[in-house]
Each structure stands twice: as C-alpha cells, then as structure tokens.
Amino acid sequence: MPFLGQDWRSPGWSWIKTEDGWKRCDPCSHELRSEDSQYTINHSIILNSGEEEIFNNECEYAAKKRKKEHFGNDTAAHSFYREKWIYVHKESTKERHGYCTLGEAFNRLDFSSAIQDIRRFTYVVKLLQLIAKSQLTSLSGVAQKNYFNILDKIVQKVLDDHQNPRLIKGLLQDLSSTLGILVRGVGKSVLVGNINIWICRLETVLSWQQQLQNLQVTKQVNTGLTLSDLPLHMLNNILYRFSDGWDIVTLGQVTPTLYMLSEDRRLWKRLCQYHFAEQQFCRHLILSEKGHIEWKLMYFTLQKYYPTKEQYGDTLHFCRHCSILFWKDSGHPCTAADPDSCFTPVSPEHFIDLFKF
C-alpha cells in the first residue's frame, strides 16, 4: 500500500492550503528552530583553527549542493512540457501502457502560446469551439482549467487589439449554451468538479459576452496611407482574397467605394464556387426579377445548409510514421527516411476524432 511518508511508521505529511496552492508543513519545524536558536553556540569556541577550516569547507560544499539541487528541480519543473508534440496511441502495448486522451493532448500542445501567433489563432478558436459543443465534459479537471485559462487570454487579447470579435462571440455563444444545459441538467451527466464551479464558469462566460458586446472600436487617427487611398484594382484584389462572406460585408461598410466593390456579382459567384458544389447550387437557386442569379443571397442561404471550407494559416500536423501530433514549426523527433511525406495536416474536426475511442 503506498504511503506518503519518509518512514513506513510515520503518519504521513501534513499539508496546509495557501493562496498559491497546497504546501507541506512541518508541525515541529517552528519548535526546532526556536530551540536551535536558543542553543546555538559559536563553533569557534569548541573548534581550533584547523578544524574550523574543515567545518567551513563542509558547510560551503553542502550549501552549493543544495543550491544545485534546487536549480535542477526548478529547471525540470519549467521544462516538463517543453516539447510541443505528443505521441497519440489508442491502446496499451508492451512499451506503452494506457492511451492518450484529449485532455492530455490539450495540455501538452501549448495552445496558450499558439493564440499569440496570428496564423494559429483561428485554428485554436475553432478547436475550442468544437470542444465546447461536444467534448467539454470529457476533459480532465486540469485540462478544463487550462481550457478556461486559454479562453480568458483569448478574450483579453480581443478586448485589447479589437481583432476577431465576431469569431469569439460565436465561441462564447456555443460555450454558454453548453454550460447552461449542463448546469440545468445536473445529475444527468458526470461533471468533473463541484456544480458551483460550473455555475461560476457560466457566470464568467456571460461576463465575457457582456464585455465583448460593449466593445467599442475607436477610430484611429492616421495621417499616412489608408485603405481608401489604394487604387480600385488593388481594393478589388483584396476583396477577392477573402474566404468569409461576412468579412466582405463588413469591409464594404467602411467607404462607399468599398461598398460598391463588395456588391460585385462576380465576387460572390466565385465565393460560392469556392465553398459549394454545383449540385448544391441547383437545389437552392435564387433568381432576381430580371432572371439573374443572386449570388450573394445564395451564399448566405447555402451557408445555412452546408459547411463552408475553412482556411488556416498554420495547423497541427500528424506524422503517420511516428504517430505523433505536433506543430509544424516546432517539429518532432522523426525517424522516417523522408519525414515530409509522412506529415498530414490535422483539421480541428480530425483533432477531435483522433481521441474518440
């Protein structure tokens, strides 16, 4: 039977809860220190010069050893999850016991720093949204805490730089719906932690939603070159780069020129052709009074029935040779002869599917 003591006869360690977490306390430490201070004797009284030099050397060596051990423990604590990859295994083998869970992968892949990278931001937000919809209760307690810490950083980032508020509003809407169902249906599903924790999380999410609702984007005073100063063909080229219809609509509200360009039928036709198949067009064909196809209305109509293609600047990758999930920039210790041929981009949906057993 495992025992948390230095000696098998001892009653175990005592712990005290502080603001920084649980810390081990020694009930006899204060009495020993007070007694030690009372009976401290100057060692020079009982030692001669030669013995005193040996005593000082031993004390110095012991101090250096303690400092080295402390530094080693501190370094190990900081670099425990330094590697930004994880081995994905779904069954026990002779070499590996157990299996990798979604919560473990979520903790190991360093999503906290990934949100600071503009290429990975949308990918991480989409992944958090999928977890909020269906996988929140499958996370461990540590993974859930990490999840909400990352979400807090995302909300603060949006409030500070005023970028991607619509994306985060959608995430918080799905999360608040899930938390509301879990809180109202307490007892119907297994929740990790006390119900009060989940109520507190729901209140926090509602507070974040209110902050984003009150977000006011201040107009920047810029005396340099602005978007409206660019030629029409460059503005049109920028609009054709967008893959989200709502981004086109939002940009069209900036100036009358951009509004005129955003209403171009060819722009919306290409957007529909990019996201949807021709068979889907025929099922939801929308014509104007003059008999022309309303591509803009068709895009938003088709969006309700079919999923749109998603683009990400950077995604997680899976190595088929090593069965390792990793960020491509960080890499992983691959043993394949041609590593690049073994890499497969992992979409947020595929990431969730990897951990369904």
Curated annotation (Swiss-Prot):
Its main location: nucleus. Residues 225-273 form the F-box domain. The F-box is necessary for the interaction with SKP1. GO terms for molecular function: actin binding. Expressed in all tissues tested, except striated muscle (at protein level). Expressed predominantly in the cerebral cortex, the hippocampus and the Purkinje cell layer of the brain. Intestine and kidney show also significant levels. Pathway: Protein modification; protein ubiquitination. This is F-box only protein 25. Keywords: Actin-binding, Nucleus, Ubl conjugation pathway. Substrate-recognition component of the SCF (SKP1-CUL1-F-box protein)-type E3 ubiquitin ligase complex. May play a role in accumulation of expanded polyglutamine (polyQ) protein huntingtin (HTT). The gene is Fbxo25. Part of a SCF (SKP1-cullin-F-box) protein ligase complex consisting of FBXO25, SKP1, CUL1 and RBX1. Interacts directly with SKP1 and CUL1. Interacts (via C-terminus) with beta-actin (via N-terminus). Residues 1-83 are annotated as: Interaction with beta-actin. InterPro entries: F-box-like_dom_sf (IPR036047), FBX25/32 (IPR040394). GO terms for cellular component: nucleus; SCF ubiquitin ligase complex. It is found in: Nucleus. Transmembrane segments: none annotated. One of its GO terms (biological process) is protein ubiquitination.
